[in-house]
């Protein structure tokens, strides 16, 4: 059921960016988590929900380099319908428990 405590939420992560041959790490925000989905035994056309959000892009200027680096930032996160135009909406291979323990 919906008893899982792992919902969709923003998470701060560090990513590497490169410009002018210089690499730096910056902090950004991504969407992370699981969305409730009943997986019936029969094939149906239920709308699959994924953890996604509103994204914007920011620019980081590395010292000594005139070329800025654009990187994504999640502004908010929620369980939304899976968009096959920009996301893999198929099943994950293998066994994925509905409420994994991390």
Curated annotation (Swiss-Prot):
- Per the UniProt entry, the glycosylated residues are 12
Any one GO cellular component localisation term in the record:
extracellular region
**Subcellular location(s) of the protein:** Secreted
Origin superkingdom = Eukaryota
The record's disulfide annotation reads 8-51, 20-65, 31-77, 35-79, 82-89
Q: Which GO terms describe its molecular function?
A: hormone activity
PROSITE patterns cross-referenced by the UniProt entry = GLYCO_HORMONE_BETA_2 (PS00689)
Q: Which UniProt keywords apply?
A: Disulfide bond, Glycoprotein, Hormone, Secreted
- Matching InterPro entries, A to Z? Cystine-knot_cytokine (IPR029034), Glyco_hormone_CN (IPR006208), Gonadotropin_bsu (IPR001545), Gonadotropin_bsu_CS (IPR018245)
* One family name in Pfam for this protein: Cys_knot
Q: Which SMART domains match?
A: GHB
- Gene3D superfamilies in UniProt: Cystine-knot cytokines
Complexes and interactors: Heterodimer of an alpha and a beta chain.
Question: What is the recorded function of this protein according to its Swiss-Prot or TrEMBL entry?
Answer: Involved in gametogenesis and steroidogenesis.
Give the family this protein belongs to, as stated in its UniProt record. Answer: Belongs to the glycoprotein hormones subunit beta family.
Report what the protein is called.
Answer: Gonadotropin subunit beta-1
Organism of origin: Thunnus obesus
**By which gene is this protein encoded?**
cgba
């Amino acid at each position: 059921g919906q008893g899982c405590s792992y919902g969709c939420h923003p998470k701060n992560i560090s990513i590497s960016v490169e410009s002018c041959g210089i690499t730096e790490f910056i902090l950004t925000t991504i969407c992370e988590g699981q969305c409730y989905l009943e997986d019936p035994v029969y094939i149906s056309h239920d709308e699959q929900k994924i953890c996604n959000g509103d994204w914007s892009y920011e620019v980081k200027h590395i010292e000594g380099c005139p070329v800025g680096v654009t990187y994504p930032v999640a502004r908010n996160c929620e369980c939304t319908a899976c968009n096959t135009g920009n996301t893999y909406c198929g099943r994950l291979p293998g066994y994925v428990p509905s409420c994994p323990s991390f």
